[in-house]
Amino acid sequence: MKNLNKNFLYTFLHRWLGDGLLTSKGPMWQKRRKILTPAFHFSILLQFVDVFNRETKNFNNLIERQYLNQPIDVMPIISDFTLATMSETSMGTKVNLLTKTGLKYKSAIQELGNMIMKRSTTPWLWWQKLFDLSPLRKIEKKDLEVLHNFTTNIIVEKSRNFKTFDDHFDESVTKRKYPLMDILLNAKFRHKGIDDTAIRNEVDTFMFEGHDTVATCLGFTTMLFAVHSDFQREVYQEIVNILGTDLANKPTYANLQEMSLLERCIKESLRLYPPVPVMGRKTNDEISTKFGVIPKDVNVFIHLYDMHRNPDLWLNPDKFDPSRHLPENSQNRHTYAYIPFSAGPRNCIGQRFAMLEIKAFFCGLLRKFVLEPVDTPETLSLIQEIILRSQNGIRVKFTLRQ
């Protein structure tokens, strides 16, 4: 397989994520991908719908208690939602943001993420020796201690009485939830070539990749539903047609799979606002293209934000139009014209997980509230870092649905 290596910017993550799936390469990457694949099996995803529904209900209760009928920046509370879901599904332990330990973990993961983004946009900090002399190194060291200790303590605790299980999952697996850490511990105790450090790296990678990216999608999609009230009404009707109006009826995996309009709206949000707006690769070999030859050992960047709005690929590219993702409208589109989850062998291993979480969130949110616009695409001040962000937040108004 050619050109599977990430480019040099990903080395900034090594002290945090080690040789996790995001940063590893070659045989190591292939081995880890094989070990991790069972964690995203259909039968495992079935079990996580309960987690998504419960945390969505908690999110809705928070909105109803504190934020009704007023403009609020949704990003901080959405970030807390994804932190809760990701910690429970990856570690089997929900980060309690009301405790000192939980608050330290939340602060560290956000601070370290911001530090990496700062470094990625400051060329003189790309050199390791200069970075280590900068004040950012002190922040990195402090935050890594918090994050690594948190994950390591859970690994040690779970290892004490861990019982191995058959990892050939099928639809009958319903009794026990299998968070990512359990899948990895099972691989360790069944001697599949993974140790505690590698387990920590993979769990931390999942937290890093899944927390901010999903939160970004949820934030921008919330704004788009508020702005486009016609689609908000249509999606709400789709949900009612499947679940009825009784909020006690929680969506199942099968219910969420039926929500095709909701999925198209999410896909269109990911086109307009890809959470990871730029991806990087390093060429292993010389590549010939119609524009010329790309030499070996060159860092190549793929600008998803621009590609997803390229008028040569998309009619009226800045328009929110979920019908683009109907099968009849996308079947002739180039395979790599739309890649919010990357593409090829190194695509996002958790993309089905992410889509399920996002659909469960909006299924619960739109049944409870009407979203009214405060910010619009025109008022946002976007910044492209490792994660796409709005500098001035994303404000929405929530009113109870009658």
Where are each of the predicted segments found?
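Cytochrome P450 heme-binding "Cys pocket" and the immediately downstream C-terminal segment
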Residues: 2, 229-232, 351-388
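Conserved cytochrome P450 catalytic core segment spanning the I/J/K helices
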Residues: 14, 41-43, 143-218, 248-255, ...
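Cytochrome P450 heme-thiolate "Cys pocket" and heme-binding signature region
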Residues: 17, 22, 38, 209, ...
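Central I-helix of cytochrome P450 enzymes
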Residues: 82, 86, 90-91, 143-151, ...
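Conserved cytochrome P450 K-helix/beta-meander segment immediately N-terminal to the heme-binding cysteine loop
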Residues: 302-330
